[in-house]
Each structure stands twice: as structure tokens, then as C-alpha cells.
């Protein structure tokens, strides 16, 4: 059962997503359920992705960039590393998002309601 104090770990793997990330991050910040943490792993972007992510992390303490070396892992490897990090922090619930997603404001609150019924 999802407890009220359990944050949802949002896992975001990025690669050259500069044109998508501002809208994605804005949609996460606009969630009506504020109890979340965003873990991001960039897979060696050569555009402005890291600058956008760094600004988001400076602006909101719930946003964290996972620094895990320079090896390119692809999306599967990046999500695996993000899950490992989240589990090492005691995460019980995850939400995966792609860099080109835009979430509706109720996404996490509706997910939390559905999880309480399980």
C-alpha cells in the first residue's frame, strides 16, 4: 500500500533532449501532488540538455542529476542505473518518464489514488 509519506521517484533518462526538456520539467513541477523526487541521468548529451537540467536542479531541490561517469548506456541502461540509485535510497514507488513527455497535472495524484486500492 502506498503510504502518504512515500515520495514517488520519477526517473528520467535523457539524451540530446534540449528541445523537449523545458516542457517536460515544467509539467513535472506543475504536479498537484508535490511529494516526488526527480532523478535524472543524462547519457552524454551534446546539446543544452545538461544546462536545462542543472537549472532545474538549482531551482527545485526535488530535482537531482545522477552523475555516473561518461559511459553511454542507452535508455535501458540509464533507466536501470536510475532504478538502482532510487532503490538504494529506499524508494518504494517509481514513475518512468521520457524526455519528450508532458504530464498532465493530476498524473501523480491519480496514480497515488490507484495504488492505494492495491
Residue ranges of predicted features:
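Nucleotide-sugar donor-binding/catalytic module of glycosyltransferases
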Residues: 1-118
Amino acid at each position: 500500500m502506498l503510504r502518504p509519506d512515500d515520495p514517488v521517484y520519477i526517473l528520467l533518462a535523457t539524451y540530446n533532449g534540449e528541445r523537449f526538456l523545458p516542457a517536460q520539467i515544467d509539467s513535472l513541477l506543475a504536479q498537484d501532488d508535490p511529494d516526488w523526487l526527480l532523478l535524472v541521468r543524462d547519457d552524454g548529451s551534446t546539446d543544452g540538455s545538461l544546462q536545462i537540467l542543472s537549472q532545474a536542479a538549482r531551482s527545485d531541490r526535488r530535482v537531482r542529476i545522477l552523475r555516473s561517469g561518461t559511459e553511454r548506456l542507452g535508455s535501458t541502461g540509464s533507466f536501470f542505473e536510475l532504478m538502482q540509485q532510487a532503490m538504494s535510497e529506499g524508494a518504494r514507488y517509481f514513475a518512468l518518464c521520457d524526455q519528450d513527455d508532458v504530464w498532465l497535472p493530476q498524473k501523480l495524484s491519480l496514480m497515488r489514488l490507484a495504488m492505494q486500492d492495491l
